[in-house]
Each structure stands twice: as structure tokens, then as C-alpha cells.
């Protein structure tokens, strides 16, 4: 693809590269509303949607109503050119088919084998136990095991009923271990209805038949054409809800015997206790667990999806916790290998502008999100997943989430390797409690109208990166084998900054997370290498030729990092030894491997340090977390071994990068992870070809030729900004538009635009009615609210957010159980909503309001907390302002002028929408030749500017500066500034500053004084 063709392709990116929404089907599904929302998604730059049953769904799941709704959605998606994706559950986790599986298989929920008793017994002493539950296994082992280890003693024959009596025959202390089976039972505070037993072939098979088979039977003609794939969510072999426990299932011991040719019982004590047999026992058990989870669930889904010609995708529980993911899914890379499209989730940060690298749970056990996304991207590269899907934003600052923060997160994810973004989520409805699920939402959010400011941009990033080829010459060996060998299942933490997974796992987790972050901070291009892929590599001239895209291409590695790795597989050791002996570099951090495992025989063999020609770069006694000096030394060492194609100085660990090849070109991406600008960055790109900067912001993408001194240049990055460069040998005279480089200085002369602005809004002002009085009488409840009002003209709508019964949903009107009075006059009728939500009904009550004190009363049947009778905050909406001067809210006449500043203090405290500021001005006499901009100062949260009706574009992050078109001085122009905020002021407890704060200035510079 020629560069000119690339620029043209970026202008209209196909649907397959555009965001795919998690579209929450969370209410009673109506054909007209479904079609409306799909048209909106198409208009706002989405490429598809995932039809996702969610909390609040009132249509019947996997029944005729669900089929009819999906058929409507598929039909409209075809008309709009959108892809359809399926989601395999009603809410999550996947596996219960909306509860049908648990009804079919009662008592077949997730099963654990739990330590119920652990008793230390002195030599010659007798232990007597009255057990609360009949045990599955009971063992006795020496507290100080011998080498070779003795076979555990089976104490089940010593049981009389549930009474256990046993005398310790050993010369030293013994440990008695009692293991019982436990079924997952939801309780107070547990989010999920229940986890099924994913390791039970009957249960998993029934789920696949009743879900995937249901879709295949009814929509088979659309599968593989209109329907692209099906998403599995948050499944796992064991949820970790009981800590001193392992995953278990019906006939698990018999399956182990069949698969492994030996009994599982001798392994079980060493999953919980330390001893010479522990590491080999753990390796065999956790690998068998992973194999079973894939065979019964993950792989079975892949098989039916392949047969239906659709992608199997999704993310799995605790994939971002390295030690925990061993317990929950066995082997992350093996799971990714058995999907046809790899996916991951990243739901934060919870605070707007918060760090994308920090973790909430301290050093040990912290979620390794950056590492997990890098793992997923590398898995996609090696196993040939066409995309890296990322479920995004779900817990990212709630209703405060704005498009600037969305862009900051997307740029970060793109730098890590994601290239198919799935906003979590877009609500079908925000009625009732649904509005408190997960942002960013769509129709109900003012930001929706500006969505193309991120969807077009993100689609271009995806188009450039999808199907990339790696240029990494540094690889980090993934420590799966070490984690499996050392995973402890402690009863509690050993110290405040530790987990219950053991010291070795804690060290691996903390150091692996920090290493990946440091490689990102320091622009070291790398891949995460699973052992099965490394074992397929060939050694040549001091390099590892690692197969990528299932052998369709290769990645040439010159340095392999072993981070805190204690155990590796035999073939891995042989490959690395050959690599090192042929001039390759193997750097060991904290540990050299001390044991090698043969997965064929199940034998673990000790290694001596002298057996390994590997460099121990970081000694075992180095502190964790490592001091900055260590990472600096590692950076110097890596660059001496493997010169990096990109370097950024003065970035303060806030700028990360990505380098890849595609279409025979090399691309370089830089992203500012901070919500603050990064100035005067020293960038070096080591590429002899001319360098173009791609401008992905414009409606028509453009380029700038980069002027560099031997690949070195200075760069400013604004808050959350992402820039992409391409090395292009044909770039000497680009036949495409040229735009100014970023980071330029401000013009020299300014003119302040002071005084009030003409002001209006794109929707009615709104006032939530809160702090009302509640009365109960027999089976009814009354909510009473008071407010002041002046004489108002025009309609004033009363919005009722009241959960409906099924009969009311079908009829689309409230029954007589709901009555509303305004000043003792009955209000209504209420109709489906147009202001907030279809299911938040509205009635015009302007004729019932009066000057002075007003009283609004709602009476409804049933108990307040019953789902079908819950009354949520009502709202008043209309052409009014809200005065904050009284204890009660007061509706005052609308205004048509507003000063710059916070509009929540000027009559719009709860307004969520677009404020439109207009001003007529005469341009200053700035001469014939000039460059000029409009600087809006500060605002919240995004803005678009029009001059004489012509849009100057959308800005979602500062600086809030817009380049003006060429106009002669003295010209009179109509200036319009539109500012939108988030829904936080409507739904949140306290208004956030919103609007155009200013100061607003015209700024210009005469040509010859320097470029903008």
C-alpha cells in the first residue's frame, strides 16, 4: 500500500476496525427503540455491537422475545453496515444460560476441595477429631518430609462415622489434613448469581448446547456473515472464593487417572503443604486442571464456533492476577491459544486522570493490567488471532468519564497492543438502577453527540495496528511453569504486603508487573514469550527465530529475560542453552532456574548454577520492588545488547510507545498517559528513511514531514495525546495535505472576548427531585416533594422513573397503582420518554404548577424495595433556571445570556447536555498575512466551535485552541462555542464545574514572526 493510498484508507475505515459496543439489553426490548439505537451507533462511528443480556432485562432470555429482538437487531445492523456479535449469557459470568443450567442441574455449581482441618500431631500422640462434614480425603504426612518423600497415609479407613482417631507413628511431627467438597453458594455481597461447574462435562455441554446451539438453530444463516463471533465472559475453573481450596469436580480423580495414568491422591497434600514433592505435585495438578478447563469449556466453545464460522472470544476471570490466574484458569497462554480471537478487559482507572499503571492492592497480589494486556497482545501475535479485543472503560470514573479520558485510555491500550475496542457499556435503558452499572453509555450521555471525536480516531489506530508484525528483539519468558510449581494455598497472608499464594509467587507477580511497566516507560520493544512458542524457535547467528502468526512469519530475538524464574521445561532449557552458546543473551533477574520439568514424564530435576550459561544480572537479594537505579542499569544493559529503534528522553515515565511493521513500513506510536502535557521531549527514531507524522485527528487525515537531525527531534505532547509516525522511503514530496506540527508556541498578540454571551441549551434544563418525604400506609407508599416556582411559560415535564410490571411494559403505560398529584391535582397521562430514556415516562405539568410553593406527590402500590415497585428520583424538565438561594429548589425564568464561568452556579446545577454560547464580533485589524487561533481558556468537558456556521472541529482535551480560517481583518463574524459536560451533575451527589470558563481570546501572529 502506497502512503497516499494509506491516507485515503484512513479517511473511511471499514466497520471491522471500528469500536464494537457492549450493548446492554437491560429492559423490555422494543423493535423501534432497538432500530433507533442501532442507527445512532452507525451514525457515531461504531462498527458493530455485542447483543448483551444484562441486569434489568425484562424480555425473556433465550425465548421468543429474545429471538424476536435479536432478529430485529440483525436486520437493522445489515441496513446500517454494522457487524453483530453475540454474548453468551444474561449478565455474567458465562455458563448458566440465564439460570437454566442451574435449574437443570441442581447441586452442580462450582465445586472446591477445601482444607477443613489441618492438625499438627507430635510423635506417638493420638489425634481425635469430630468432623462437621464427611471428608472426601484425609491424609497424614510427616511435618518434616524425608527425601525421597514418603507416600501420604490415607486416613479414611480410620474414620468411624465422622469421628477420626489416629496415632502418629513417625519419629517426628505429622500433619493431618482433612479435605471436604464444597459447592459454590452465593450469599450477601456476592455479585454473581452463581458459578456453574465448568469442569463438569455434562454441565458445560448443556450450557453450550442451550446457548450456542440455540443461536445456531435460529440464526445459522447469519453466523459467519452478519454475526462475527460470540463472547464468553469471566468464566473460570475456580473463583478463588475459598482460599485454602483447589478446583474440583465430579469424577475428577477418575479423569486424572485416565489422563495421567496415575492416582491424584498422592499429589493432594502437597498442593497445600511444603516438601520435596510439592513442586512436582503442583505442576502435575495445575497443568491437568488447565487441560480439563480447555477440553471441557474453552476448547469446546472454540470447536462449535469454528464449525459455525464465527470467532470464539471473551475474557476470563482474574486473567490479570498472575498467581491467581493459575488457580482460576490454569495457563493464560493456553487459554488464548484455544480462542480464535483473543480478548482482555481493562475497566479502569476508577478516578478520572488517575494512573494507568498503579494498582490498588499494594506490592503483592496487585492486578497486573499492563502485563496482562501485553500477554494478550503477544498471544495474538504467536497464535495468529486477527485482533486483540479489549473490553474497556466499565469502571472508569463512572458518570464523570468524558471523551478526553476515553482518548487517554484508548491511546494507552493501543500502545500496549489492543486494536479492537469494546466500550463497556452502552445501555439500552438507564431507567432505575440500570444507570448505576457501567459507563460510558450512549444516547443518554451528552458526550454521545461528540462520539466521533474518539471513534474515528480509535478506528484509524486499529486500522494501522491490526495484524501487525513484531520488531521486538527483546523477549520476556512468561513464568507460567514457575507459578504452577510454587503456587501455595495459604490460609492467610503471612505479612501485610503479602498474599496467601506464597513468597515465590508474590515475588514473580510484583517483579513481572514492574518489569513490563519499566520496559514500557523506557521504550524497550518486547514480546512476552510462552514456553511452547519458544520451544518452536530456531537458533541462528546469535538470534532466536521465533515463529509468529502460527509460523507465517518470524520475530528475531537477541535477548531473553528470565524474571524470577525458578522452574522451566526441559525443551525450554535446551533451546535457551543453545541460544546462549551461539551468542544470544539470556539475562536472569533475581533467580537462575534451579529445576527443570519434563512434562512428558512428570519428573522435576534439580539444576546446578554451573549448568546454565546465563547471566545473573540482578542478584537474589535485590529488594522488591526494585529501586530506580536497578531499572536504569537494566535499560543501559539492554540497549548495549539490543539497540532500540525509538528513544524518548524527559518523559518522566508518562510516555509509552509502540513500534511495529505493516504493509512493508515501520510505524512508531507515542502516547502521553498523563492528563498533563509533556513538554520538550527528546525523541530519537533510528530509521534512515524519511519520517512522516500521521495526523489522525482531522476528518481528512493528513501528514507532516518530520525534520530530524540524525533521527533526533523535539516533541511536545498534550494531555492524553497519541502521535503516530511512519518511516516511508517515498515521502520526499507527499501529494497529500500538510498540517502544522504539534507543540508549537502561542501567537504573540491577543484580544480578550469579554462580556456576556447569548446562551441556550440543546435540551431542557432539568431538576432531580431529591430529599422527599416518604410515608407508608398499608400496601401503598407516598413520596412527597416540595419546590418553589415562578410564573413559567412553555411546557414543564415531570419525569417518572418507576419500575413497571410486565403488564405495564407490554401496554407501555402505568396502571392505576401509580398516581401522581401536583398541588393536589392528578397529573398525566404519562407517555414513553424522550428527554432521558424511553422507559422514564413523561407528562407536561406546566398547567398544574403555580407561583410560590408547590407540592408533588407520588403514590404507588407494593413495598418500596420490591423490584416491580421501586420509585427512583423523579425529575422536572423545561425552560427554566434553578435558583440555589433557598433551602428548597426554586424554578426561575429562563435566561438568554450567560457569562463565562461555571454554569452550575448560574442556574444549571444539574443540567447534563450542551450549552451553546454565541457572540457577534468584529475581527481586529491584523494585517493581510497572519495566522490566528481562538483560545477558549478552560472549559468542561468538550467543545466544538463554529465560525459563520462552519465547524472548526471538536476538542476533547486541552489545550482548547482552534485554528481560525483565513479572514480579513475587520470582518464581522458569528462565533458559536458549544460545550458539553458529563451526566455526573444529573446523577451524582454534587455538581461538578461545567461550561465555558475562559478567558476566551483571539490570538494572532504576523507571518514572519514564527509559525503557530
Predicted regions and their residues:
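Acidic/aromatic-lined carbohydrate-recognition and catalytic surfaces
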Residues: 52-170, 176-205
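Short, aromatic- and glycine-rich surface loops/edge beta-strands on solvent-exposed regions
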Residues: 174-181, 723-727, 855-858, 975-977
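Extended, non-globular alpha-helical segments
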Residues: 35-43
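Carbohydrate-binding surfaces of carbohydrate-active enzymes
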Residues: 2, 15-20, 24, 30-36, ...
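Beta-strand-rich ligand-recognition modules
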Residues: 341, 812-876, 938-940, 944-996
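N-terminal pre-domain segments of enzymes
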Residues: 1-12
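Repeat-blade elements of multi-bladed beta-propeller folds
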Residues: 931-933
Amino acid at each position: 500500500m502506497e502512503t497516499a493510498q494509506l491516507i485515503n484508507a484512513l479517511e473511511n475505515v471499514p466497520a471491522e476496525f471500528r469500536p464494537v459496543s457492549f450493548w446492554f439489553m437491560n429492559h423490555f426490548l422494543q423493535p423501534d427503540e432497538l432500530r433507533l439505537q442501532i442507527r445512532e451507533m452507525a451514525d457515531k462511528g461504531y462498527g458493530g455491537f455485542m447483543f448483551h443480556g444484562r441486569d434489568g432485562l425484562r424480555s425473556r432470555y433465550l425465548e421468543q422475545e429474545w429471538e424476536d429482538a435479536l432478529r430485529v437487531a440483525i436486520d437493522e445492523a445489515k441496513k446500517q453496515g454494522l457487524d453483530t456479535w453475540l454474548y453468551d449469557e444474561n449478565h455474567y459470568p458465562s455458563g448458566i444460560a440465564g439460570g437454566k443450567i442451574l435449574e437443570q442441574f441442581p447441586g452442580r455449581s462450582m465445586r472446591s476441595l477445601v482444607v477443613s482441618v489441618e492438625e499438627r500431631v507430635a510423635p506417638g500422640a493420638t489425634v481425635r477429631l469430630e468432623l462437621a462434614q464427611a471428608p472426601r480425603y484425609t491424609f497424614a504426612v510427616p511435618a518434616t518430609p524425608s527425601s525421597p518423600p514418603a507416600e501420604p497415609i490415607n486416613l479414611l479407613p480410620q474414620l468411624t462415622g465422622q469421628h477420626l482417631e489416629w496415632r502418629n507413628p513417625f519419629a517426628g511431627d505429622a500433619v493431618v489434613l482433612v479435605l471436604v467438597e464444597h459447592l459454590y453458594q452465593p450469599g450477601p455481597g456476592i455479585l454473581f448469581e452463581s458459578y456453574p461447574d465448568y469442569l463438569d462435562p455434562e454441565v458445560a455441554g448443556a450450557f453450550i448446547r442451550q446457548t450456542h446451539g440455540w443461536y445456531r438453530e435460529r440464526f445459522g444463516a447469519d453466523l459467519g456473515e452478519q454475526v462475527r463471533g460470540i463472547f464468553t465472559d469471566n468464566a473460570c475453573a475456580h473463583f478463588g472464593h475459598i482460599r485454602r481450596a483447589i478446583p474440583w469436580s465430579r469424577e475428577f480423580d477418575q479423569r486424572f487417572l485416565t489422563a495421567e495414568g496415575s492416582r491424584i491422591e498422592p499429589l493432594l497434600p502437597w498442593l497445600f503443604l511444603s516438601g520435596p514433592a510439592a513442586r512436582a505435585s503442583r505442576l502435575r495438578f495445575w497443568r491437568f486442571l488447565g487441560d480439563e478447563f480447555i477440553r471441557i469449556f474453552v476448547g469446546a466453545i472454540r470447536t462449535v464456533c469454528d464449525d459455525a464460522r464465527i470467532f470464539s472470544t471473551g475474557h476470563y476471570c482474574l486473567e490479570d492476577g498472575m498467581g491467581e490466574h493459575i488457580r482460576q484458569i490454569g495457563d493464560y497462554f493456553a487459554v488464548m491459544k484455544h480462542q480464535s480471537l483473543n480478548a482482555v478487559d481493562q475497566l479502569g482507572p476508577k478516578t478520572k486522570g488517575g494512573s494507568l499503571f498503579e494498582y490498588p492492592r499494594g506490592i503483592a497480589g496487585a492486578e497486573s493490567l499492563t502485563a496482562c494486556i501485553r500477554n494478550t497482545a503477544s498471544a495474538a501475535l504467536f497464535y495468529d488471532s486477527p485482533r486483540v479485543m479489549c473490553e474497556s472503560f466499565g469502571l472508569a470514573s463512572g458518570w464523570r468519564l468524558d471523551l478526553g479520558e476515553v482518548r487517554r485510555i484508548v491511546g494507552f491500550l493501543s500502545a500496549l497492543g489492543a486494536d479492537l475496542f469494546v466500550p463497556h457499556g452502552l445501555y439500552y435503558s438507564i431507567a432505575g438502577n440500570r444507570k448505576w452499572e457501567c459507563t460510558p453509555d450512549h444516547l443518554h450521555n451528552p458526550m454521545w453527540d461528540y462520539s466521533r471525536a474518539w471513534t474515528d480516531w480509535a478506528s484509524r489506530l486499529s486500522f494501522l495496528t491490526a495484524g501487525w508484525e513484531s520488531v521486538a528483539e527483546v523477549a520476556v519468558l512468561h513464568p507460567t511453569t514457575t507459578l504452577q510449581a510454587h503456587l501455595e494455598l495459604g490460609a492467610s497472608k503471612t505479612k501485610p504486603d503479602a498474599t496467601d499464594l506464597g513468597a515465590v509467587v508474590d515475588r514473580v507477580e510484583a517483579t513481572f508487573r514492574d518489569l513490563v511497566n519499566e520496559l514500557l516507560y523506557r521504550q524497550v520493544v518486547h514480546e512476552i514469550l510462552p514456553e511452547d512458542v519458544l520451544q518452536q524457535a530456531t537458533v541462528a547467528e546469535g538470534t532466536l527465530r521465533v515463529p509468529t502468526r502460527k509460523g507465517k512469519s518470524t520475530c528475531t530475538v537477541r535477548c531473553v529475560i528470565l524474571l524470577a524464574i525458578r522452574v522451566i521445561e526441559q525443551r525450554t532449557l535446551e533451546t535457551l542453552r543453545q541460544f546462549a552458546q551461539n551468542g544470544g543473551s539470556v539475562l536472569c533477574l533475581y533467580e537462575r532456574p534451579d529445576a527443570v520439568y519434563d512434562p512428558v514424564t512428570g519428573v522435576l530435576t534439580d539444576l546446578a548454577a554451573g549448568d546454565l550459561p546465563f547471566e545473573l544480572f540482578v542478584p537474589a537479594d535485590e529488594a522488591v520492588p526494585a529501586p530506580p537505579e536497578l531499572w536504569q542499569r537494566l535499560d543501559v544493559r539492554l540497549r548495549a545488547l539490543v539497540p532500540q529503534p525509538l528513544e524518548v528522553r524527559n518523559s518522566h515515565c508518562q510516555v509509552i510507545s509502540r513500534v511495529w511493521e505493516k504493509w512493508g513500513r515501520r510505524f512508531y506510536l507515542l502516547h502521553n498517559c498523563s492528563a498533563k502535557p509533556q513538554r520538550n521531549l527528546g525523541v530519537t527514531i533510528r530509521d534512515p528513511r524519511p519520517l512522516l507524522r500521521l495526523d489522525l485527528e482531522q476528518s481528512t487525515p493528513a501528514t507532516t514531514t518530520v525534520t530530524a537531525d540524525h533521527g533526533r527531534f523535539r516533541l511536545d505532547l498534550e494531555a492524553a495525546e497519541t502521535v503516530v509516525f511512519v518511516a516511508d522511503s517515498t515521502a520526499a514530496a507527499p501529494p497529500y495535505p500538510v498540517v502544522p506540527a504539534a507543540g508549537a508556541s502561542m501567537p504573540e498578540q491577543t484580544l480578550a472576548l469579554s462580556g456576556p454571551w447569548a446562551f441556550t441549551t440543546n435540551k431542557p434544563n432539568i431538576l432531580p427531585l431529591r430529599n422527599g418525604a416518604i410515608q407508608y400506609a398499608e400496601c401503598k407508599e407516598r413520596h412527597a416533594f416540595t419546590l418553589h416556582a415562578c410564573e413559567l411559560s412553555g411546557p414543564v415535564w415531570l419525569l417518572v422513573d418507576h419500575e413497571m410490571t410486565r403488564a405495564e411494559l407490554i401496554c407501555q403505560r402505568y396502571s392505576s397503582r401509580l398516581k401522581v398529584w401536583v398541588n393536589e391535582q392528578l397529573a398525566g397521562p404519562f407517555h414513553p420518554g424522550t428527554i432521558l430514556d424511553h422507559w422514564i415516562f413523561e407528562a407536561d405539568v406546566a398547567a398544574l404548577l403555580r407561583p410560590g410553593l408547590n407540592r408533588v406527590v407520588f403514590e404507588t402500590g407494593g413495598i418500596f424495595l420490591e423490584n416491580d415497585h421501586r420509585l427512583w428520583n423523579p425529575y422536572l424538565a423545561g425552560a427554566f433556571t434553578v435558583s440555589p438561594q433557598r433551602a428548597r429548589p426554586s424554578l426561575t425564568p429562563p435566561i438568554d445570556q450567560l457569562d463565562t464561568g461555571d454554569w452550575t452556579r448560574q442556574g444549571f446545577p444539574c443540567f447534563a447536555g450542551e450549552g451553546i454560547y454565541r457572540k457577534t464580533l468584529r475581527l481586529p485589524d491584523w494585517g493581510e498575512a497572519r495566522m490566528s487561533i481562538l483560545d477558549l481558556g478552560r472549559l468542561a468537558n468538550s467543545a466544538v466551535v463554529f465560525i459563520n456556521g462552519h465547524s472548526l472541529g471538536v476538542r476533547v482535551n486541552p489545550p482548547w485552541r482552534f485554528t481560525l480560517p483565513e479572514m480579513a481583518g475587520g470582518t464581522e463574524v458569528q462565533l458559536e462555542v458549544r460545550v458539553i459536560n458529563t451526566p455526573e451533575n444529573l446523577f451524582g451527589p454534587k455538581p461538578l464545574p461545567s461550561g465555558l470558563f475562559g478567558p476566551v481570546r483571539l490570538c494572532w501572529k504576523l507571518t514572519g514572526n514564527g509559525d503557530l
